[in-house]
Design a protein with these regions (language model features):
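A conserved active-site cap/scaffold subdomain adjacent to cofactor or substrate pockets
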Residues: 84, 88-91, 115-119
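Short, surface-exposed, charged loop/turn segments at secondary-structure junctions
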Residues: 27-32, 71, 79-83, 101-115
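A glycine-rich helix N-cap at a beta->alpha junction
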Residues: 10-20
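Short, small-residue-biased leader/transition segments that mark boundaries at the very start
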Residues: 1-12
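Flexible, low-complexity linker and terminal segments
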Residues: 98-230
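Short gly/pro/ser/thr-enriched loop/turn and capping motifs at secondary-structure boundaries
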Residues: 18-23, 97-98
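Conserved thiamine diphosphate
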Residues: 35-81
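Active-site-proximal loop->helix
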Residues: 23-35, 54
Length: 230
């Protein structure tokens, strides 16, 4: 959501993306691919909205895409997104087996299983837990330390990809779109983002759980403020 990303809140936007509105009997959604044909809707004449691309353009500081048929990856990406210190957008391609599971569709289960191109293998290591790294038989690994001390370990597969490079993320998504590939994984992350709580020195404790005594200024503080005003 472009408007939401203007303010650096700690928020996760998770999309269960299947390309249709199932509750209204299979209408095209904004992410339905152009040329898709559905029984009750005909042929879609519009270009799809790429959620990951929109999130990048709107300055989200965590952008990822996964496929519901890869639950291990979904689980790890959710952990990282929830630990992220800024705006996180996770696009989960989730096939609708009732209204939109055509074999050649980007949002179908068979397409996802056969055309998925993972950028890397992902492991999430929460902060304050013992960190162990096993020997890797192939490839190299890259550690990305999040704001709270948590670490994301990326094991590179075939692609030489840096998820902290925003320009490279745009290029990768554009190439995947041209090649009709479903690229999944951590697309972009800014581990050094400062959220609105840090900017304004706000407490972690929710206001509705903060005791009145803690919120009410002391008489000395009130007198000091009054002296500045009058």
């Amino acid at each position: 959501p472009p408007r939401s990303t203007l303010f650096p809140y700690t928020t996760l936007f998770r999309s269960e993306n299947n390309g249709v509105y199932g509750l209204t009997k299979g209408q095209f959604s904004a992410t339905a691919e152009k040329g898709l044909e559905l029984k009750k809707q005909g042929i879609n004449p519009f270009l799809p909205v790429d959620i990951a691309m929109e999130a990048l353009a709107s300055n989200a500081t965590f952008v990822a895409r996964s496929f519901a048929g890869d639950p291990k990856q979904v689980k790890e990406l959710l952990k990282i997104a929830l630990a992220h210190n800024g705006i996180a957008v996770l696009d989960i391609v989730s096939p609708c087996v009732t209204f939109h599971n055509h074999e050649n569709s980007f949002h179908s289960y068979s397409f996802g299983k056969s055309r998925e191109e993972p950028l890397h293998e992902i492991s999430f290591v929460p902060a304050r837990e013992e960190i162990t790294v096993e020997d890797f038989e192939e490839g190299t690994s890259r550690e990305v330390t999040l704001h709270d001390g948590s670490t994301v370990i990326l094991k590179k597969l075939e692609k030489d990809y840096d998820p902290q490079n925003r320009a490279q993320a745009f290029k990768m998504l554009a190439e995947a779109q041209m090649n009709n590939e479903l690229v999944t994984g951590l697309i972009y992350i800014n581990p050094d983002v400062i959220n609105i709580f840090d900017m304004y020195n706000l407490p972690d404790e929710p206001l509705n759980r903060t005791k009145v005594e803690k919120m009410r200024p002391s008489p000395e503080s009130i007198n000091l403020v009054n002296s500045w005003m009058f």
